[in-house]
Amino acid sequence: MISYQTEGVKMPDIKKKETTGWIKEVAACYGKRVGEIAYIFCSDDKILEVNRQYLQHDYYTDIITFDYCEGDRISGDLFISLDTVRSNAEQFEQPYDRELHRVIIHGILHLCGINDKGPGEREIMEAAENKALALISL
C-alpha cells in the first residue's frame, strides 16, 4: 500500500492513483513488489529536523528515505521537502511536476537498491530516474 500524507504543507497536486501505479511499475522493473510505502510531504524546516534527529546531518535536502525493505518487498517512509523540490525545479529549469515526480521515484529507486553517493553512482541514479519518468505522462 502507498499512502500520501502531509506535515505542515498543502498536499501537492498529484494524481495519486496514476502515481501509485507508476511506482509499482517501476518497482517491478527491478524485480520488486510494493509493501508499505508512506510519502510524507513536508517543509524545509521539517526535513531539516528529520535530517538532524535521525541522520545527524545538518542540512536541507529534497528527500530522506527510511528503508524498511524485506526481500523483494520494498517498504519505507519517504520525507519530501516541497520547498526544496520547488527551488530545485527553478534552479534546474524544470517544471515543478516533473521535479516532484523525479524526487518521488528517487526514493523508490533507493529502496530498489540504487545508490547515488559513490563514484559513478549519481549518473546511474539519474539514468534510472529518466527511464522511470519516461513511463509517466506529466
Swiss-Prot record:
Keywords: Cytoplasm, Endonuclease, Hydrolase, Metal-binding, Nuclease, Ribosome biogenesis, rRNA processing, Zinc
GO terms under biological process: rRNA processing
Gene Ontology cellular component list: cytoplasm
Cofactor(s) of this protein: Zn(2+)
UniProt GO MF annotations: metalloendopeptidase activity; RNA endonuclease activity; zinc ion binding
EC numbers, comma separated: 3.1.-.-
One Pfam assignment: YbeY
Record note on cofactor: Binds 1 zinc ion.
InterPro entries: MetalPrtase_cat_dom_sf_prd, YbeY
Residues binding Zn(2+): 106, 110, 116
Membrane-traversing stretches: none
Intracellular or extracellular location(s): Cytoplasm
Gene3D superfamilies given in the database record: Metalloproteases ('zincins'), catalytic domain (3.40.390.30)
Function text: Single strand-specific metallo-endoribonuclease involved in late-stage 70S ribosome quality control and in maturation of the 3' terminus of the 16S rRNA.
Family of this protein: Belongs to the endoribonuclease YbeY family.
NCBIfam families to which the protein is assigned, alphabetical: rRNA maturation RNase YbeY
Stored PANTHER family: ENDORIBONUCLEASE YBEY, CHLOROPLASTIC
HAMAP family: Endoribonucl_YbeY
Name of this protein: Endoribonuclease YbeY
